[in-house]
């Protein structure tokens, strides 16, 4: 059993930690030399800002609408990331750091002690209390399903940022709503090939014939399908 702990809009949230007045404001973080947008909050997304937008093209309009931009500060982001990972290492027996803002937790033994959704909320609370960073937690029997759960935790506000898809009916319901290109490891080219075979959702992918997939695609996709089942 695994949990994926993923920080919400990590770079932008790091900046907000020291500027609580920006909690509901549109915020973007810019690349080196302020070239383009590398992180943005949902409020910025609601203004039509997108990842990699050139700053010189959007600066005037963004500021007119009350947006705030920060130059990237990777030393700060690394420090906050280290603090978050240290908290997780106190909560779970094994932590695999996947990126600066994501980590997989091995939940072996934890399910015997407490409800897994409750554990996810403990992670949320501890990280918010000690760092000020909002996170979401996806829980599932495999790492790929933990990623699926994280997608659901982000997509659906009723989850309040924590979703456990251990129960088969829960993950089937979610996978039927999840576009196949949202699956971990499905890039643009693979998505196009899958769509050509009418595989448009995560559930469709999970039902593909393993033998045919091995012949037409790759062992990596075979492994992904196995992790979805």
Residue ranges of model-derived segments:
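Gly/Gly-Pro- and Ser/Thr-rich, intrinsically disordered tail segments characteristic of DNA damage-repair
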Residues: 1-226
């Amino acid at each position: 059993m695994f949990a994926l702990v993923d920080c919400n809009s990590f770079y932008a949230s790091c900046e907000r930690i020291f500027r609580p007045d920006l909690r509901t404001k549109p915020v973007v973080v810019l690349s080196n030399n302020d070239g383009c947008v590398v992180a943005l909050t949902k409020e910025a997304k609601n203004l039509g800002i997108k990842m990699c937008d050139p700053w010189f093209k959007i600066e005037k309009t963004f500021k007119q609408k009350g947006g705030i931009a920060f130059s990237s500060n990777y030393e700060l982001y690394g420090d906050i990331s280290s603090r978050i990972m240290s908290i997780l290492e106190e909560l779970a027996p094994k932590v695999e750091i996947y990126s600066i803002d994501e980590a997989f937790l091995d939940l072996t033994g934890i399910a015997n002690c407490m409800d897994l959704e409750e554990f996810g909320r403990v992670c949320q609370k501890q990280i918010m209390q000690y760092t000020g960073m909002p996170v979401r937690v996806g829980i599932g029997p495999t790492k790929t399903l933990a990623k699926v759960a994280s997608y659901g935790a982000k997509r659906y506000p009723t989850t309040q940022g924590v979703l456990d898809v251990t129960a088969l009916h829960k993950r089937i319901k979610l996978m039927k709503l999840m576009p196949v290109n949202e699956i971990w490891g499905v890039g643009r080219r693979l998505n196009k090939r899958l769509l050509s075979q009418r595989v448009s959702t995560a559930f469709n992918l999970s039902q593909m014939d393993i033998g045919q997939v091995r012949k037409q695609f790759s062992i990596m996709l075979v492994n992904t399908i196995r992790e979805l089942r």
